[in-house]
Amino acid sequence: MTNKKIKLTQTVKAAGUAAKLGPEGLADALAGLNRPADPRLIVGPETSDDGGVYCLTPEIALIESCDVITPPADAPRAFGRIAAANALSDIYAMGGRPLTAMNLAFFPACSLQPEVLGEVLAGGQDALNEAGCCLVGGHTVEDDELKYGLSVTGTVHPEQVLRNSTARPGDCLLLTKPLGSGILSTAVKGEMATVEQEAEAVAWMSLLNRAAAELMLRYTPSACTDITGFGLIGHSCEMALGSGVTIRLYLDAVPLMQGVTDQVADGMVPAGCYRNRSYYLSRIDAGDCDPERLLPLFDPQTSGGLLIALQPGAAALFQAEAAENSIFCVLIGDVLPRAELPVIVV
């Protein structure tokens, strides 16, 4: 395959975080594992948080995370940047600063030229440079499909770790990127997306969550997570269950990327979206909401935005300052005392 003809999304079965194992399969796989017994482990796997946090000293803790994805975009350099932005996001979501990273590349050497991998790695380096994160090495595996990601280590003060399990009743919920990257990536793969839709999806997926995270830290958030493979509904369920609360989402307020509604109507919905819906639908109260309108809320996001829980006064100030600094931010819900189900959509 020559480099000029490459459309990376067509070389893989599923694009971006839509290729992740579904929540039901993952839950089954993890069911027999025990929590690591180490008093210095601040955050482990039990709350499905964005990363693990390990205390080194009274003032320094490490945030550890790893993300690997298939291409959600056709251009190799764009794919590399998106994959790195996706991996860095977990550190930002937990209130940390990315420190070091290692490349993880799975490459079909029989079907793609080495220059393609070079472009992918260059795109990843672009994002790391912007984040001020030092690349220290990596690992490659020859594989049937192209996959790329990074393991990232960040630092945070042990008493300032942000979790997905500490939302409080009365909090407002803010989202810092629109939804739809999984749907639009599927449309790109199926050659159904317009040039404008593809460009918008790539731009949002390429955007680091750094600016939103740095602003967030000024307003003492109750909780935070990033929206990735399990969609807005899935990650809201994780936050609600971990926090012992119910999250209410305002369907009309949830922002979507350009063309998402049309692509859903045309059937450009990734299998991962349906897996998420199958697993989480019984865990939410969606009332009489139109099922088709709900689909983007289950859409697996690649390098999605932050879901931030802030007290109302802080949320208003955050929104105002975000607008002044051209940081995307939309109020999409609030946090209620625990009801029968973890998530309500109205």
UniProtKB/Swiss-Prot annotation:
ATP binds at residues 20, 47-49, 67, 90, 138-140. Mg(2+) binds at residues 50, 90, 226. The record marks 20 as: Important for catalytic activity. Its cofactor is Mg(2+). Binds 1 Mg(2+) ion per monomer. InterPro entries: PurM-like_C_dom, PurM-like_C_sf, PurM-like_N, PurM-like_N_sf, SelD_I, SPS/SelD. It comes from the Bacteria. Disulfide bonds: none annotated. Homodimer. Belongs to the selenophosphate synthase 1 family. Class I subfamily. Synthesizes selenophosphate from selenide and ATP. This is Selenide, water dikinase. It comes from Trichlorobacter lovleyi (strain ATCC BAA-1151 / DSM 17278 / SZ). The lineage of its organism: Bacteria, Pseudomonadati, Thermodesulfobacteriota, Desulfuromonadia, Geobacterales.
